[in-house]
Structures are given as structure tokens and as C-alpha cells.
From Swiss-Prot:
This is Membrane-anchored lipid-binding protein YSP2. It is found in: Mitochondrion membrane; Endoplasmic reticulum membrane. Glycans are attached at N1306, N1373, N1430. The gene is YSP2. The lineage of its organism: Eukaryota, Fungi, Dikarya, Ascomycota, Saccharomycotina. Residues 1-97, 174-194, 200-219, 285-308, 338-418, 455-485, 505-543, 777-843, 1225-1257 are annotated as: Disordered.
């Protein structure tokens, strides 16, 4: 115990000052004395020598290599293994122990770590022996050699007990020795590497000196080992290797005859009874992972001089295991003491081919490629030579001690020194500091490629190895007989190693290691042997086994998958954010490709599979259907972004292997939380979530597949701002913050995620119960989310129920329906009318609270039951019509069982008109039926949540609808509204005001729509009856048609895009769907050509027929813009994208106008949706969008003009269609049939009124021949829009007629007595005469006089003009009057003769006045000229 404590306290560096002084003093002693002294001290303690490791570093710049020395104790028997003593005289080589046939040296498994402490100080003679008599003196600790290569080779010996659970694959189990010869052709491979030397340990009571074990020659010469005991220190080891390399000349020794004969046969292994039962030599080719990159090592010149100087390196055998990055980062686990020995029954032998050996000088500078490499293959005895290309290594055994009797005859102890021939940059430069990662050496040139190629002609089913053909193993020549086997093995780098603990006894070891084989799920276990002889029965297949074959080009990307792997979590800094999967059993060994843009799990075959959730024991049950190859998958209820945004999205993430067909849904501004907040934008597509940030050239990109997401949750930033979203994958957590509308983004991501993961199950209400709630089994997917939205309840309506089935009467025969007209009315009314038709006024039992505001009180002229069932009945089409009238869109399915379940949930998107804030918001509605009595009142509570508005998650809007009876059997509607707050907000008053105003507006729209629906019911019933009566006539309309003539109403599959503009969605064409298709897109193109010409177009080309559902039309369109060209050429491409005459058809039209400004940078995309409407008509919806491919300064103007032009063209299209239909209908003799129909419906008040109007029209037409065409009213359908317009026009014409007829009787008697005096209807008025007044008063008379034939007759206007001149003469200045005129007038007055031609007299008066005025002006001009200075010049000019 004292020695044991001393060993535990001993420093690995062992560089203390006193130790050095002691060593210096001991150097003065002879080597033999020191050896004897050491042996005496070791024998007195009655313990075996302990193995140790020492380290020295050779620092050459950055290439620092840890040079290792392994000091082991090797016992010997009477015919033991000869080892060199490393003494100064050649005589020391005279005594060489022989290999004993009975008790061979036991191989020792050495770790490849630079520092190891043994948990035991010494081993006693009895307590340290297992049941087989093997003394366990040294329990090495399994570790990693470097970051490039771990424990790779299959192991034939049991493993030690260690403190870290690691799964280790064993290539074979304990094998009993037989006389069967196994020939291994180790020279058949072209990629052979230098095989490491084998270290054998001789643990003798007489000598515990470490010695370099050498090959025994046939003459069995024993060489005494006089190497000094280095006391297991680093400094002693350095001195020892220097002493051995410089002072001694290698000598040749040989093995016994039997071994030499084995070597001469190149790999034939003979096992006989003369050998010790515990002597087992392993056969393998030790190849270091770095040897392929470094090439063959140089051979020492003294290689053939002394084979006894061959360093025998004990290589620990290990299974093909992998190491994890966390294992490398925490080497403190590996540096802890080992515990618990393990033993094995048998080992195997390794043989080599070459006969050269390296001298100690060469071995002192071995490269890292010759260092200790774990193996897992059996070996045969070494040959007399060892070359860098083929080094034979003794297999490892965890039993390091032998019997006491064996120790007495063993006097040699081998010391093994590890030194590189060349100095290379270390793979692990910070070994032992806890921060080692595999990524540091991922790109190293030293990575080797592993291949295990089985000879196709010589592949055997050996009971020692069960062949698992997983990759490239030949399947053609597999023999069940034992025979030669050629194996070429090279090992690749592991990415993970897992070490398992073993028990002391062999029985416990077997039970502990007997586990089921873990193989890939997609490969069957081939040629498996299940008996006790199966050497792989006690192994777990991690990533590889020795029977697998892999390509050299394969990269390191696998790790073992033990049961404890997923229970352990790495706490290294790079893995702190990684998600830990629950401890479940997976059948596949998988590894995450870090360099891949999308994370996949790779199976052993190098194939990639998407992750699947697993459950159970050893079986995989896929919870989510991750069929990535389903290209037909399409998201439902999702509005995609514009093509321009989608193009930008593909450009930003072009390096992320994005699918060209992937569509962008929306992008939001947010920030990615890392060391700092990286402000950027989140792009949500139908397959990925992308984030792109570019801050001053620092680009950050994140691309997350939806199929890799395991959890989405909301997060509060800084504890107070609810604007964050956390997205978890299996390996990383992403935190996004600074969302403007966090809840809306969260709902969208969750919706897309659920549809992608659950697929059709989600869309069909996966896991929903009858009440629309999510069941317990399916709610497990959403337990981690704190979103309380009841989106799953939106799909609880039965998809098989058609709302029109209850009201459709298309299957009823027309004649039967006409005969039972009243019965049909009763059947129709029962669909929406429940309760009594008449009732006295009632009052609702409701007392509003202080927060309730009265929104409106209105009266609806309909019974209570009719109004309530119209809003909340089974036919939800009325309510959808009301919501659309309120300008809502993206309306979710509305449950039709509200009156029975008394609760319903639905959602829609409402546009907002606020100057600030969002332009739209999602509304989540929950209606609750609190009271339902159609003879009293009905109360409905509606709760609305608006998550997209500011502070939308802390308030809800409650609206109470009260329906009660009112006067005249009508319905009284009272609406109260309130806002409930669950938190505080700075904009509370603004939200409340906007809420009250919004509810008031929507309620008014609802009431008006209810009245319209009720008023249209009678007309709809009559039109339906008429359609049934005239069905036979409509079938023979002279118009082309295809498809069924009768069908129930349908809805098109329309998803409004972000930049789409709805031109019109309420267009109805009174013909079946097939007729509209034939008119617009059928073979007869004359109709569409005429329509195009009527749309202000000319130079229309010949309209072609559709070829492959596409055609192209060109024409020239007139433009009426104030600037720009006055016409442009239009190139129209029409494509039928969906064709189903039983549902709907959609035609996409792309118009290009190259002649307009920026015409090459945009195109107008218009989609026409045609579906079945009510009464076998066709509904038409037109949606347009301007798609830009370049930039323009006139973008707004062009878009506005394009949309306006499309709107006018659509209107013209509909008008022309209706004209074509009406003209085709008028060619039929429908007047008599329709007249009979009108005569039959005498009970209708409107019909009686129409008949009276017709009688009046006929009486009026007899009085005036102009109205003889009044009989055409019989051909007019009064209930149609055209009939109503005809009647209105008729009444307007009638009013004008009566006005013209009786207008002449109302004229007034006007007479002018004297100038200034007028007589109107006997009343005399004074006025100032002027021409303006005169013509205004006598305008009618002037017009009449102009139309008269006797234009010479005097009228009142000309007569009055003369009187005016007389009035001017009488009151004028007499001096000014012209004598001629005056005499003329006096002469006229004296003669008192009335002038015949008054007009001539007035002209003379005008002429006289004009001459007078001219003379006055000339006189003034003369006076001005006379006043000038230049009088002479003026006179000359005159």
C-alpha cells in the first residue's frame, strides 16, 4: 500500500531537483551493480514492475511532437523471450531467452496517451491472478493517439475497466487454438503501411529492468539485459534511450526453428501442444492512419546487423470505435485512474513477411506514423526482420501479469521508446487542456482513407468472424469452408469513441458485452453466425467492422451510436446550444454534416436520410412523415409573395442549395441574437426559414429547413418586450428578436411548419375530436408552444357537407316544380326560417355594464327566426357574403353547426385604414350562443382578437348581439361593444376609439346586407322558377357549349398575392360554365375577336386556337393619355392553367406593350377565374398584377393606367358577352312561352302590377302611332335587369310626351303698349327697353318667326325696335339730330302712314348714326394734329 500511494503521488514529468541529483549519483555506479541493486529491491517487495509512460517534447517551431516512451515489464520463463538488455558490452547479448512453447510472454495493451497513472502500485502473487492464472500487473487506460486517428482496429482481447462508458467493437472473441493453418497474404496489398513493433513484457522476480525485447534466433542465444532501471521517470527514460542508441551496436538474434520456419512460409501459423496455453501471438498488419500520407519510412543502415535491437511495441487492441468532440475536449476524464482488470482466454498470433529490422537508432526517431495504434486483428509470430512497410505487432491483452513461476525465469524487461523519424506538425497541439476539437484537424492532409477490401475469390465464413456485408464486400464467392483468407486492411479516422466498462471476470465480461448488433435499418445482416464461436457476438457495431468495405474517398462523418451516447451531453462552448435528444434507441448510426447547408443524419453507407423521431426499443417509429420527395405538396391558405420578392430571395440564398421551385411567402424585419443583435430580414418560404443580414459588408446568413425544426416558441426580449421567437433544431437554437408583429409571424411559421411536417393530416384536421379540439395524442406536438390560438378549431366543419345541398332544387323536374309552386316556396322557406312567423314585441334580458357602449339599434323587416338563421344557420354563405361586404378577405371555413354546438371559431383578415400602424390585421373570432329562444330573444357574444395591431395581445373586443321581436312581426337588433384589457398600453384611448368606430361601421354594413338578402329572396325564387320553366329552351340556345349544362355552385382555388389587384369578383354571366368557355376560348374565335375589337382595339390578328393550352394574340390599342404615344402594339399570351368544367377553369393572360415608355420592363398578368354560380350560371373573377423586370420612374403611373385599362376592358368583355347571349336568346320564340308564364303567376302582386301597366301601354299606343311598338313589352322579362331598365325608360318618354302635348296651352299673353310699358296677362309693367331684355322675353316668338314661311310678316321684335328708335329721337338733343332723318320721320308722322318695311327704316337710322359718330371722331383727330409743333409737315401731309 505504501508503494501504491507513492505511485499515485508521483509526477509524470518527474523533473524534481532531488531526483536529478539521485540519478547523477547513480550514473557513477556500474551498470551491472545498479541492475542488481534494482533487482534486489524489486524482489524484496515481491511485486512486479509497473508499466509507465514518459514524455518528452521536441520543439521545432510550431511542429511540436510529443515523443513517447513506454516502459513495460516483461516476464520470462525458462524458455522465455529473449530481449536485449541494452548493456555496454557485447557480452550482454550472449544470453538470450527462448520463446517457450509452454509459457509464452503475454502481450500488453498500451495506451496511446502521453500520461497515464496506474491504479495499482504492485501486484501480489495470488490476488492479482484471474482464474486462468494470468497476473494483471498493469491496467492500461484506453485513449486516443491523436485527433486524426483513434482506436480503429478490431480487438481480440477484452478491454479494461475505465471510468468513461465507451462502446468498443471487437472483431473476434476468444478463439481456441486448433491445428488449422490460416494463411494470411499480407503482401498482397499495395497500400501496406509500416507495422509497429511489438512490446512484450517479461515480469521476473529476479530482474525488473525494462529491456528492449528482440527476436529470438534459432540458436536460442540468450542475451543478458543490463539496462539500468530508470525508476519510471521521464528523465530516466531519456537517458536510457540515449545510452542504448549510442553505446550499443545491434546484434542479430534469431527465433527458434519453428518460428523461423513459420516466417519462411510467409504467414503460415502453426499452433501446437508444445506451446504454453497462454502464449498467443496475434496476426495483423499494424498500419498507422498517418502512414498513407507520410509514405514509407527510411530504413536504417544497421537494420540487418542486430535483430535483437528491434523494439517490440505492445499495441493495445481495440475495436473500431469512434470518438466524439466532447470526449476530446475533456481529457480530464481520460486522465483519471483506471480500475478493474479484464482478462481473456485466448489470443491470436501475428506474422509478417519481411525480414529487415530497424536499428535502435532508427527506432529512436520513429515518425508518429509508427507510434502505437490500436488494433483488432489477430497476429502470428514475428519474423526476423521488420521493415517500415510491414511491421508486425503483437496483439494486445489486458492481462499484464503471469504466474509467479513464470516470473522466476524471466529476467528481461523491455523498454519501448517512441521517437519520430521526422518532425511533423502535431495533430493535437494543446493535448490535455480540455479544448481539443475534431474540427481543428478536419482539413488536415494527414487524414487517411480507409478501405477494407475482401478478396472476391477467397472470402470465407470463418467462425471467428461473422461477415456483415454492408458496402463493397463481394457477394459472389462466399464459401462456408475454412481456408485461406486474404485481407487487406487500412483504417480511416473515427469521429467518436465510446469506451465501455467491463467487469473483472470473464463470465461477467461476456454477459456485459453480449448485446444485440446495431446495424443500419436499410441493410440486412448477412452471413451472421450466432453460436458461441462467433467472434462478433459480444461486439456492438458502431460505424465500421473489419468486414465492411469503404471507399478511400469517404470522408470522416460517422460516429458510433451506443445506448449511452444520447444520454451524455457535451458542455464544451461550441455545443452549449445543441439540443440533446432524449435517450431513445436508434438503429442507425448517424452523424451531422457540419459543412452541409441542411442538416441530415448520415448512415453508415454514406447515404443521407432526414431525421426522424424515434420511440420504442430498437425500432424507429416515424412520428412525422418527412417525405422530402413529395414535389406535389402544396401549402393551403398561404399567400405567396410577388415574383420580384421571390427572385430576390433566391438571389440572397443561392449558395444554400435552394430548390428553384421554392416560393417565398413573406419577409419580415427582425434581428438575430448572437454576440450582438444582427439586424436583418427573415425570409419565410414553403420549405425554409432564412435570415440575411448585411451590416457594413459583414454578411450573416442562416438557412433553417422546416423539417429540421423541433420546437418553436415565443420569447420575451429583456423580460419586458414580447417580440422574440426561438427556433430549435436538433443541434442549434436560433433566437430572433425585434419583430414588429411577433404573433402574426409566429402563427405563420407554425402554420407552415405544421403543414410541412404533418402534411395532409394537418389539413384534414389531424387528431381532431368531434368538438373540433385537438386530441391528447396529437397535442403532444404543441405542448411546448405558449400560443393559445385555436387555429385547429377552424377546420372542424365536415368537408363532405355542401352548403348548397340544402337549398339546391336542380334535381326537381321543371314540370313538377311548376305544378307545385307553392310547395316549392314552402320548402325553400324552411331552410332559413325557424320559429313563428308572427309574434308580439319582446325585450331582451340584458343589462349593459359600465364598459358596454351602445353601438346601434336597428329594425329588420323579417321574423326573428329568419334573421337569426340567416346569420347563424347551417347555410354560412350568407354570413360569408356579409364578411366580404365588410372588405374582409382570407376568410377561414366557418362552422355550420353553431346553433347545435353553441360555439364557433373562425378567422379572417381585415384591412385597416389608419395612417400609422399595420395596413391589415388578422381577426380571430369566437362566437358563443348564450341565449336562444325564437319566441323571446337571442343573445350572441362575439370575442375578437387582433394580434397584429399594436398591443394586440393584451386586449380583446367583446360584442353582444341581441335579437328580439319588434312591431309588425319584425326583428329588433341591438349591439353593445366593449374592450377588455389584460395589460397596460399607452395607446389605450386610440385603440378603444378605433374599435368603437370600426364596430359601428361593420354593423351598419351587416344590417344593410341582411336587408338586401331578404329583399332579393323573392326575386331569386322567381328567377329560379323561371329558369326551371325555361330550361328546355335554354338547352337549345344557339350558342356553342361543352360540359354539363347543370351544376351546383363551386368556388375557384384562388389565393390572393401580395401585389394582386382584384378587378371584379362579383361578375355573373347567365349561361353555363361550358358556354362561357366556348365563347371566349373555344374553337369558334369570331366571338372573342369581336369583343377585342369593341375594346378600342384595331389591327386584330386572326385569333388562333389553343395549342397545348396556350395561344398568342396581337393587336393595336388606342391610348388616350395626355402624353406619350397615342397607340401601342399589344402582345397577349393566354394560357389555360386549370381546366375542370365540373369545378372551375382559370386562364392566365400576359400582356406586353413594347411601344409605351418602359414597355420592356413590365408586363400585365391577369388571371380570369370562371366557376359555377347559382341557377346554372357562371361566376367570373378577374385579378391583375403588374410584374416588373426592371426599374422605372413612371412605375406608379404605369400601374395605375394598366389597372384602369384592365378594368375597362373587363367591363366591355362582360357587356359584350351579355349582348351575345341576349341576341342568341332573342332568336328563339320565347315571347309566347314567357307570356304564359306571366299569366300563370297571377297570385304575385308584382305580376298583377305588370299586367296593369301593359294594359295602360296598349291604350296609349292606340292614340299615337309613335307608341305602336309598345307591344314589344310582351317579350321583355320584367324581373330581369333589362326589363326594369326598359320600364324606367318608358316612363321617362311618357313624361316628355305629355309635356310636349300640353305645353302650348300654358302660354302667357304679353303685349308692349309703348316703349317702356308692357302688358302681361292684363297687367301693365314699366321697363327700360334694351335688346337683352327684349330677346329674353320674346325668344320663343323669335324662334317661331324664323320657322314660319311668311318671314316678311312683322313680329313683335322688329316692331319694338322701331319704337325704341322713336323713343330715342323724342328724348334726344334736337341739335344733334340729323336733318335728313328728322325730316324723314316728320314726314312719316305727318302722313301717318305706316311704314311697310320697318327694317329698312331702322337700317337708315343706324347708318345715319354711324356717319355722325365717324364725323365726330375725324374732327377730334384733326384737332389733335393741329396742336403739334410740326404744323408744316402736317399741312404737307394733308
Amino acid at each position: 500500500m505504501r508503494d501504491e500511494a507513492t505511485r499515485k503521488k508521483r509526477s509524470f514529468s518527474d523533473g524534481h531537483f532531488f531526483k536529478k541529483l539521485k540519478l547523477m549519483s547513480r550514473k557513477k555506479q556500474p551498470v551491472m551493480e545498479r541492475s542488481k541493486t534494482t533487482r534486489t529491491r524489486k524482489e524484496s517487495t515481491n511485486s512486479a514492475a509497473k508499466s509507465s509512460l514518459s514524455l518528452r517534447r521536441a520543439n521545432n517551431g510550431r511542429k511540436t511532437i510529443a515523443k513517447r516512451r513506454v516502459l513495460t515489464d516483461i516476464g520470462s520463463t525458462n524458455e522465455g523471450v529473449a530481449g536485449n538488455s541494452g548493456s555496454n558490452s557485447p557480452a550482454q547479448y550472449s544470453h538470450t531467452p527462448h520463446f517457450s512453447d509452454s509459457i509464452p510472454p503475454l502481450p500488453l495493451e498500451l495506451p496511446d496517451i502521453v500520461s497515464i497513472r496506474s491504479s495499482r502500485s504492485h501486484i501480489s502473487n495470488k490476488s492479482n491472478k484471474n482464474k486462468h492464472g494470468i497476473d494483471l500487473t498493469f491496467i492500461p487506460r484506453r485513449s486516443l493517439q491523436n485527433s486524426k486517428a483513434g482506436l480503429k482496429k478490431p480487438n481480440t482481447s477484452p478491454q479494461g475497466y475505465f471510468n468513461i462508458p465507451v462502446t468498443i467493437d471487437r472483431a473476434s472473441e476468444k478463439v481456441k487454438h486448433t491445428d488449422t493453418k490460416n494463411t494470411f497474404n499480407s503482401s498482397s496489398s499495395e497500400n501496406e503501411r509500416p507495422v509497429l513493433s511489438i512490446l512484450q513484457k517479461d515480469d521476473s522476480q529476479s530482474s525488473s529492468h525494462p529491456a528492449i525485447d528482440s527476436m529470438s534466433a534459432p540458436n536460442n542465444i540468450n542475451n543478458n539485459n543490463d539496462i539500468e532501471n530508470s525508476s519510471n521517470s521521464l528523465f530516466d527514460t531519456i537517458l536510457s534511450i540515449a545510452h542504448s542508441a549510442i553505446s550499443h551496436v545491434p546484434k542479430i538474434s534469431a527465433l527458434n526453428t519453428e518460428i523461423q520456419r513459420e516466417f519462411s512460409h510467409s504467414g503460415e501459423s502453426h499452433t501446437g501442444s508444445t506451446r504454453h496455453p497462454y502464449f498467443h501471438i496475434h496476426h495483423a498488419q499494424q498500419q498507422h492512419p498517418l502512414s498513407q500520407q507520410q509514405g514509407p519510412l527510411p530504413v536504417s543502415e544497421n537494420a540487418n546487423q542486430n535483430p535483437n535491437d528491434t523494439v517490440l511495441i505492445h499495441s493495445p487492441s481495440a475495436n473500431t470505435a469512434h470518438r466524439s468532440s466532447s470526449f476530446l475536449r475533456h481529457l480530464d476524464y481520460l486522465l483519471s485512474p483506471t480500475s478493474g482488470p479484464a482478462s481473456d482466454k485466448h489470443t491470436q498470433v501475428e506474422e509478417g513477411d519481411d525480414e529487415e529490422e530497424l536499428s535502435p537508432l532508427s527506432k529512436a526517431f520513429l515518425s508518429p506514423s509508427t507510434q502505437l495504434v490500436p488494433t483488432n486483428t489477430s497476429t502470428t509470430p514475428l519474423s526476423g526482420s521488420l521493415t517500415p512497410n510491414n511491421r508486425n505487432v503483437n496483439a494486445n491483452s489486458n492481462s499484464e501479469t503471469e504466474n509467479d513461476n513464470d516470473r522466476d525465469d524471466r529476467s528481461n524487461v523491455g523498454k519501448v521508446k517512441f521517437q519520430p523519424l521526422k518532425v511533423h506538425e502535431p495533430a493535437i497541439s494543446t493535448f490535455g487542456k480540455g479544448n481539443l476539437t475534431l474540427e481543428a484537424v478536419a482539413g488536415s492532409s494527414d487524414i487517411d482513407n480507409t478501405t477494407i477490401d475482401l478478396d472476391e475469390n477467397n472470402t470465407n465464413n470463418n467462425p471467428n468472424a461473422s461477415s456483415t456485408n454492408l458496402s463493397h464486400i463481394s457477394k459472389s464467392n462466399v464459401n462456408n469452408n475454412l481456408g485461406p483468407k486474404e485481407l487487406n486492411t487500412s483504417y480511416r479516422n473515427s469521429t467518436y469513441i465510446d469506451m465501455a466498462r467491463f467487469e473483472n471476470s470473464q463470465s461477467n465480461l461476456s454477459s456485459h458485452r453480449a448485446r444485440s448488433k446495431t446495424l443500419p435499418a436499410n441493410k440486412a445482416l448477412e452471413n451472421a453466425v450466432g453460436d458461441e464461436g462467433n467472434s462478433k457476438r459480444n461486439s456492438r457495431y458502431s460505424s465500421y467492422s473489419n468486414d465492411m468495405a469503404f471507399d478511400d474517398a469517404d470522408e470522416r462523418k460517422f460516429r458510433s451510436m451506443s445506448k449511452k451516447f444520447l444520454n451524455r451531453r457535451s458542455f464544451s462552448p461550441s455545443n452549449l446550444g445543441n439540443k440533446v435528444i432524449p435517450g431513445i434507441n436508434l438503429r442507425n448510426s448517424f452523424n451531422k454534416n457540419r459543412n452541409s447547408s441542411s442538416d441530415f443524419f448520415s448512415t453508415n453507407q454514406g447515404q443521407q436520410m432526414p431525421r426522424t423521431s424515434t420511440a420504442g426499443s430498437g425500432n424507429i417509429h416515424a412520428i412525422m412523415g418527412l417525405d422530402s420527395g413529395n414535389d406535389d405538396f402544396k401549402l393551403e391558405g398561404i399567400e405567396y409573395a410577388s415574383e420580384k420578392k421571390n427572385s430576390e430571395f433566391h438571389t440572397l440564398f443561392k449558395d444554400c442549395d435552394i430548390n428553384p421551385n421554392e416560393k417565398l411567402i413573406v419577409d419580415h424585419s427582425c434581428a438575430l441574437s448572437r454576440d450582438i443583435l444582427l439586424q436583418g430580414r427573415m425570409y419565410i418560404s414553403d420549405a425554409h426559414i432564412g435570415f440575411f443580414s448585411n451590416i457594413l459588408g459583414w454578411v450573416s446568413t442562416v438557412f433553417i429547413p422546416f423539417k429540421e425544426i423541433v420546437q418553436i416558441e415565443k420569447k420575451t426580449t429583456a423580460g419586458i418586450f414580447p417580440n422574440g421567437i426561438v427556433i430549435d433544431t436538433l443541434h442549434t437554437k436560433y433566437i430572433f428578436a425585434s419583430f414588429m408583429s411577433r404573433d402574426a409571424t409566429f402563427d405563420l411559421i407554425t402554420d407552415v411548419w405544421n403543414q410541412i411536417i404533418l402534411g395532409k393530416k394537418y389539413r384534414n384536421g389531424f387528431g381532431n375530436n368531434d368538438d373540433g379540439t385537438i386530441s391528447d395524442s396529437s397535442s403532444a406536438f404543441f405542448d411546448d408552444s405558449d400560443d393559445n390560438d385555436d387555429d385547429g378549431d377552424l377546420d372542424d366543419d365536415d368537408p363532405d357537407i355542401n352548403s348548397t345541398d340544402m337549398t339546391s332544387s336542380d334535381d326537381i323536374d321543371a314540370d313538377v316544380f311548376n305544378e307545385s309552386n307553392d310547395l316549392g316556396k314552402n320548402q325553400k322557406s324552411t331552410n332559413y326560417l325557424l320559429g313563428p312567423n308572427k309574434h308580439s314585441p319582446t325585450t331582451a334580458d340584458f343589462k349593459p355594464s359600465n364598459n358596454d357602449h351602445l353601438v346601434i339599434e336597428a329594425n329588420i323587416n323579417a321574423p326573428l327566426g329568419k334573421v337569426v338563421n340567416l346569420l347563424y344557420g347551417e347555410d354560412v354563405s350568407y354570413y360569408e357574403r356579409i364578411l366580404k361586404a365588410q372588405k374582409n378577405f382570407e376568410i377561414s371555413p366557418i362552422p355550420n353547426n353553431f346553433l347545435t354546438k353553441k360555439i364557433r371559431d373562425y378567422a379572417y383578415t381585415k384591412p385597416l385604414s389608419g395612417s400609422i400602424g399595420p395596413s391589415k390585421t388578422k381577426c380571430l373570432i369566437t362566437d358563443t350562443l348564450e341565449h336562444y329562444d325564437l319566441e323571446d330573444y337571442v343573445k350572441v357574444l362575439s370575442i375578437t382578437k387582433n394580434p397584429d395591431v399594436p398591443s394586440g395581445n393584451i386586449f380583446s373586443v367583446k360584442t353582444v348581439f341581441l335579437f328580439s321581436w319588434d312591431k309588425n312581426n319584425s326583428t329588433k337588433l341591438t349591439v353593445y361593444n366593449s374592450v377588455d384589457w389584460t395589460g397596460k398600453s399607452w395607446i389605450k384611448s386610440m385603440i378603444e376609439k378605433g374599435t368603437f368606430d370600426g364596430v359601428a361601421d361593420t354593423t351598419k354594413i351587416m344590417i344593410s346586407e341582411i336587408k338586401k338578402i331578404l329583399s332579393d329572396e323573392d326575386s331569386n325564387i322567381n328567377s329560379k322558377h323561371q329558369a326551371s320553366n325555361n330550361e328546355s329552351e335554354e338547352e337549345i340556345i344557339n350558342l356553342p357549349t361543352i360540359g354539363p349544362p347543370v351544376h351546383d355552385p363551386t368556388e375557384p382555388d384562388f389565393q390572393k398575392g401580395k401585389d394582386d389587384t382584384v378587378i371584379d369578383e362579383k361578375i355573373n354571366i347567365p349561361v353555363p360554365l361550358g358556354t362561357v368557355f366556348s365563347l371566349l376560348y373555344g374553337d369558334d374565335t369570331s366571338y372573342i375577336k369581336k369583343i377585342i375589337e369593341n375594346q378600342n382595339n384595331f389591327n386584330v390578328c386572326d385569333i388562333p386556337k389553343f395549342v397545348n393550352n396556350a395561344r398568342e394574340i396581337t393587336y393595336t390599342k388606342k391610348l388616350n393619355n395626355s402624353f406619350g404615344p397615342k397607340q401601342t402594339k399589344c402582345i397577349v399570351t393566354e394560357t389555360i392553367e386549370h381546366m375542370d368544367l365540373n369545378s372551375f377553369f382559370m386562364v392566365k393572360q400576359i400582356v406586353r406593350s413594347p411601344d409605351v415608355p418602359y414597355g420592356s420592363s413590365f408586363s400585365v398578368h391577369t388571371r380570369f377565374f370562371y366557376s359555377w354560380g347559382d341557377h346554372n350560371t357562371t361566376n367570373m373573377k378577374v385579378v391583375t398584377n403588374v410584374v416588373w423586370t426592371g426599374k422605372s420612374m413612371l412605375k406608379g403611373t404605369i400601374e395605375k393606367g394598366s389597372i384602369d385599362g384592365q378594368r375597362s376592358s373587363t367591363k366591355q368583355l362582360v357587356d359584350d358577352l351579355k349582348k351575345i347571349i341576349s341576341n342568341a336568346s332573342s332568336t328563339k320564340k320565347k315571347s309566347r312561352r314567357r307570356g304564359k308564364t306571366v299569366n300563370k303567376r297571377k297570385s304575385s302582386p308584382s305580376t298583377i302590377k305588370n299586367e296593369k301597366n301593359e294594359e295602360n301601354f296598349e291604350d296609349t299606343s292606340t292614340k299615337n302611332s309613335f307608341f305602336s311598338a309598345f307591344s314589344m313589352l310582351q317579350q321583355v322579362n320584367i324581373t330581369s335587369v333589362q326589363g326594369i331598365m326598359t320600364i324606367i325608360s318608358f316612363f321617362i318618354c311618357l313624361i316628355f310626351f305629355f309635356r310636349l302635348l300640353f305645353h302650348s296651352k300654358n302660354t302667357s299673353n304679353i303685349q308692349i303698349i309703348t316703349p317702356g310699358t308692357i302688358l302681361i296677362n292684363g297687367n301693365e309693367y314699366n321697363y327700360v327697353p334694351n335688346f337683352k331684355t327684349l330677346y329674353h322675353v320674346y325668344e320663343d316668338n323669335i324662334i317661331k318667326d324664323a320657322r314660319r314661311k311668311d318671314s316678311n310678316k312683322n313680329n313683335i321684335v322688329t316692331d319694338t325696335e322701331g319704337l325704341i328708335w322713336d323713343w330715342l329721337i323724342d328724348r334726344g338733343n334736337g341739335t344733334v339730330q340729323n336733318s335728313v332723318l328728322s325730316n324723314h320721320i316728320k314726314e312719316s308722322n305727318n302722313k301717318k302712314v305706316k311704314l311697310v318695311n320697318g327694317v329698312s327704316d331702322h337700317k337708315i337710322q343706324q347708318l345715319v348714326e354711324s356717319i355722325k359718330i365717324t364725323e365726330l371722331q375725324l374732327q377730334e383727330m384733326k384737332e389733335l394734329l393741329a396742336q403739334t409743333d410740326n404744323t408744316s409737315a402736317t399741312n404737307q401731309l394733308l
